[in-house]
Amino acid sequence: MEKQIFEHSVNVEEEHYQPKQEFHNMEAKLDEALDGELLDAQLEQALKPKSSFRKTLLKFTALLFGLATVAQSVQWIWDSYQQHQWIYLAFALVSLIIILLGIKEIICEWRRLVRLKKREQLQQQSQQIWLESAVKNGDVFSVHNAEKSKILCLDIAKSLGLENDSPAVIQWQHQLNEAYSAQEIAHLFSRHVLSSFDAQAKKLISKMAAESAVIVAISPLAVVDMFFIAWRNLRLMNKIAEIYGIELGYFSRIRLLRMVLVNIAFAGATEVAQDIGMDWLSQDVTAKLSTRIAQGIGVGLLTARLGVKAMELCRPLAFQLNEKPKLSYIQQELLSSVKDIVLGKNKIYKKEQI
């Protein structure tokens, strides 16, 4: 047997490297936003006050008109008194009183807007403090930002009508530590001080959303639903603002009116679609009942969405991660409320037919 010699050959495969790619003046295509994100962005854009030269000119013109009206009323009173025209004098006095009452309401409205602006500034300050604390070294907490966060939280407590010796504030102060960052201080403040206000707002949102859903589900008239949703949404905004110590005026309500109109349009459009669809498909009671339940839940969720947005705007301390209320906790309650009311009504209706 002959000896076989095997030669060890090393096969070196050539590696092919992809050359580098260079991009010059390339356009980046952004991902499309979700529907919910678009609604939030549109709402926030609608709520932001738009300052322009026309608005400044309009304010200046209104001020001149008010001063001229007051001066004309005073001149009218003086001329009527000099000429002994008592009827004209009475009209002039009434006009002056009405003008003064209007000026008083304008001043009160301006004060409400100032309070709302201060609340927005508190939110912006809290966000700025958290941003500065996050940008700095994560291991070494900034003492300056921590002190600013404490002062901001105390200012927020005063805006809510809470003194430094209130039980919630004292409990929050006992939980503080020198090693805590600005975000941790604000989180403790939210948990010990703002939690009671947040609980009231969440309970109110759930209650009014469920009521709106039930009424829309059992009401056969679209016009009634539209006016009912408008009234309930305005009342919801007022109550949430009252919980957080804000008195909404005319112009501050206008800033949230677009979301209310969305709810009104949804209630009216879905009810009209329901009527047309049921007439076209069939007169089946079960199908109509299912459509009404879905419609009521949809309106209830939109009402809850409005309440959460109003809560986010009226809350003095901006929400941190995982603090903002979600609509998931309202869905089950809405479903159970609408099913109990509507299905109970359907059983009574069937018994009457029998």
Swiss-Prot record:
The chain crosses the membrane at residues 57-77, 87-107, 211-231. GO terms for cellular component: plasma membrane. The keyword Cell membrane applies. Its main location: membrane. InterPro entries: DUF697, UPF0283. It comes from the Bacteria. It is found in: Cell inner membrane. The keyword Cell inner membrane applies. It holds the Pfam family DUF697. It is a multi-pass membrane protein. Keywords: Cell inner membrane, Cell membrane, Membrane, Transmembrane, Transmembrane helix. Belongs to the UPF0283 family. This is UPF0283 membrane protein CGSHiGG_02710. It comes from Haemophilus influenzae (strain PittGG).
